[in-house]
Amino acid sequence: MKLNLRTTVNQSFRQVFRLFTKELFLKLSPPFPKVKLLRFDGSEKQDRVVVELDFIFFKQKWESVIVEKKESKDEIFFVDEGVKLPFFLKKWRHTHRIIKNGDKADIVDDIEFETPFRLFDFLFYPILYFQFAYRKPIYKKVFSETSS
């Protein structure tokens, strides 16, 4: 199943990419489930991100690896794929696109996921949508200054 969210921010796309850091990753984490960052290498090919999700009564580890990164005059993107996923996910591929939009930038979360059962994909979609919609005001706040 696919999910796509776009947020326009008031900074250049190159500056936005430079600020895709561990600190931003932590700010983007929603209140639930609580996220403990175990490893964050960055956004370059072969970098890894490992988190522990705390669902109060149980915890799940999630590990993703950056499998692709490309840059052009109008866009920078990188792709993380889940290599160790929580039990409720069978497949995860998240393309982080930062696209030039005049003197601003569009941040696009382009996600492909599968749960163990097709029906669960439809049940999981709204949960995932709200988890990523949570990021929109954070992106806008973090990138509210004009580019330097």
Show where each model-derived region lies.
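Intrinsic-disorder/low-complexity, polar/charged segments enriched in Ser/Thr/Lys/Arg/Asp/Glu/Gln
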Residues: 2-8, 48, 61, 75, ...
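Short, well-structured hydrophobic secondary-structure segments
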Residues: 40-60
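Hydrophobic ligand-binding cavity/cleft-lining segments
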Residues: 1-46
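Hydrophobic-ligand binding "helix-grip"
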Residues: 55-102
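Short, highly charged C-terminal tails/helix-capping segments
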Residues: 37-38, 141-148
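Beta-strand/loop substructures that line and gate deep hydrophobic ligand-binding cavities in soluble
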Residues: 83-130
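A non-catalytic, amphipathic alpha-helix used as a structural packing/dimerization or gating element
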Residues: 130-138
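Hydrophobic pocket/interface hotspot
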Residues: 15-20, 66, 78, 98, ...
